[in-house]
Amino acid sequence: MAMKKLLIASLLFSSATVYGAEGFVVKDIHFEGLQRVAVGAALLSMPVRTGDTVNDEDISNTIRALFATGNFEDVRVLRDGNTLLVQVKERPTIASITFSGNKSVKDDMLKQNLEASGVRVGESLDRTTLSDIEKGLEDFYYSVGKYSASVKAVVTPLPRNRVDLKLVFQEGVSAKIQQINIVGNHAFSTEELISHFQLRDEVPWWNVVGDRKYQKQKLAGDLETLRSYYLDRGYARFNIDSTQVSLTPDKKGIYITVNITEGDQYKLSGVQVSGNLAGHSAEIEKLTKIEPGELYNGTKVTKMEDDIKKLLGRYGYAYPRVQSQPEINDADKTVKLRVNVDAGNRFYVRKIRFEGNDTSKDSVLRREMRQMEGAWLGSDLVDQGKERLNRLGFFETVDTDTQRVPGSPDQVDVVYKVKERNTGSFNFGIGYGTESGVSFQAGVQQDNWLGTGYSVGINGTKNDYQTYSELSVTNPYFTVDGVSLGGRIFYNDFQADDADLSDYTNKSYGTDVTLGFPINEYNTLRAGLGYVHNKLSNMQPQIAMDRYLESMGQSADTSSFAADDFTFNYGWTYNKLDRGYFPTDGSRVNLTGKVTIPGSDNEYYKVSLDTATYVPIDNDHKWVVLGRTRWGYGDGLGGKEMPFYENFYAGGSSTVRGFQSNTIGPKAVYKNGAHTSWDDNDDYEDCTQESGCKSDDAVGGNAMAVASLEFITPTPFISEKYANSVRTSFFWDMGTVWDTNWDPSSAPSDVPDYSDPGNIRMSAGIALQWMSPLGPLVFSYAQPFKKYDGDKAEQFQFNIGKTW
């Protein structure tokens, strides 16, 4: 080979080039060292071609271009006559990527970050990028207080210029805050100020929010909390002068010192509004009214700005700008607030689109909209659409996005982004109690049938005492105006004596149809007709049953009886919950009732009222107080009694947890000669007492009251991804059932007064709900702490497909 003349000294990573002051014509280009990169690809990345006249600048540009591809660790350009010889050393190819020792950061998150930096299997390894990644990961650990953490990239060579990449983590322990000092505070004590921080130097056992583990982001949030605390109390000149974070020599302890200047308290002297108010000055002025002498309050100023933006948003001004500038008068310690408003352009809606509704049809979502296409944009109407979609219960999350139309100064598209949840549920329930043993129930419910919004349910129960089946269908939009139509048919064969109720058998079947009429956004009225046939048999004489039979003109010794009833059913629902399942804010009231109409054998009425109110106690709605009540009352008409099988019952997972289902309230008092189970061992014996025999068999009552107070908390050990699917709560339940027609003189002296509503049962416990693929799962454990003779405890209860 002819002697090669070195043209240019090494450039970048000890690269060598040719030297040629006058340049030469390239007749050929040869490569040495290519393995994975094709010759054609390398040639395309070079600015030099065969036939070009090149000089030292062209050669330098060639080297830079080859390095820029990211495929090479070293590049040398040499001349052999008129041939350009390019010697390269390819970067190794990553064959595999593994992680070791990472506990705080998941593998998937690490892979995403590596891929974002171009580090992935099959790509070339850039050692410079790798060093940046090591430093970035260590900085992350430092930001969460793990100052002893280290991250090292271990590169293991493999044949064919490949490498295995392994990131080895030494996470260490989080540095704990030893002390937080605030210097310069005079108006408030350090303890008072720190009590509002997330970071603490001392955390009581009951404080589930406070944290001694240092995190840079939490400190920034706490400093902002400190600033807001002072600004909300009139300290308009408040300033955080400096913050020092000191680390102990072993890197396990943190000392934080915050130096502040409080300044004086200032009062608002007035608010002046200017700018483009879009003709809504009077409404904006109402939002800026202040009380004379009111202390300056930063949070109220921010709220005022937001209220002005919301007001303008209702009129189609989608992107208003509102800026408040306080003018501080140090002489008289007052602040004049100058508010500049720029309403901007007014927009109308070109299209409303939906994303994420893979099952639900667009029409099901679109009919819930209050914002119309082609109309001026109204932020309140867009929000109403979001609320209505949430209340459907079909979606885990609903978000809105107002997007400008490219090229248009006054058009936007409104996009509703939904995440669907499983609206079908397999209803399976199981309960266990010390006295009740095991009980089961099953059913299937689909609240969004084939994405149409129809609700279809098939429910059934089969056990020792009941065979029940029901088919129900509801069309929520029977008319375009939102009138709903629902109906059901059912069959029930109920052996009450095997269910720890008073002794009788009832075979019933029936049907009903109901129309629902929306009154406004939150109120719906319902009306319908129903028919039910009841055939009673095997009735053992007891006082409550005798009262009913006698009112129907039947003998007290009657053992069988049949009745056909037609009812007018009615109801009212007020629903202002923020979403259909796992609500966190708002309230719901449901009133239902029925009354028999002419042609019925029975004459009676029943009415029930259910209420639920959710009150969030934090901005993220993770801590929520829930109050619920259930009331019921019924009675006979025209001298007749309400049928005993229509009585109200309490106890169980849907009313008072910790008690066996339906066992709270009046118990059967059997008459002399009745053959029933009444003694303490549940042995079947004849009642031989002239005045009657008391029992533990529940008969229910014509009046009921149930209340519950529940504290909903974040579920421990559940990631943010599943936070909307799991709910934990601590509860206190109470309830009672009574019989307003009970006559104590008709029963033995040792029988309680069942007309007394003061016989209240109470329990407390913990519940866990999970929206599983099978439907909602509900676990509860409750301990009754106020009960009466004859009550049956059932501490643990488990249901699939049922919540209350």
UniProtKB/Swiss-Prot annotation:
Top-rank lineage group of the source organism: Bacteria
PROSITE patterns: POTRA (PS51779)
GO cellular component: Bam protein complex
Any single GO BP term: Gram-negative-bacterium-type cell outer membrane assembly
Domain (POTRA) ranges: 24-91, 92-172, 175-263, 266-344, 347-421
Protein keywords: Cell outer membrane, Membrane, Repeat, Signal, Transmembrane, Transmembrane beta strand
Annotated Gene3D superfamilies: membrane protein fhac, membrane protein fhac: a member of the omp85/tpsb transporter family
Parts forming coiled coils: none
Leader peptide range in chain numbering: 1-20
Disulfide bonds: none
Cross-referenced InterPro entries: Bac_surfAg_D15 (IPR000184), BamA/TamA_POTRA (IPR010827), D15-like (IPR039910), OM_assembly_BamA (IPR023707), POTRA (IPR034746)
Protein's cellular compartments: Cell outer membrane
Xref: HAMAP family: OM_assembly_BamA
Assembly behavior: Part of the Bam complex, which is composed of the outer membrane protein BamA, and four lipoproteins BamB, BamC, BamD and BamE.
Family of the protein in this entry: Belongs to the BamA family.
Summary of the function given for this chain in its UniProt record: Part of the outer membrane protein assembly complex, which is involved in assembly and insertion of beta-barrel proteins into the outer membrane. Constitutes, with BamD, the core component of the assembly machinery.
Protein's recorded name: Outer membrane protein assembly factor BamA
Organism: Salmonella paratyphi B (strain ATCC BAA-1250 / SPB7)
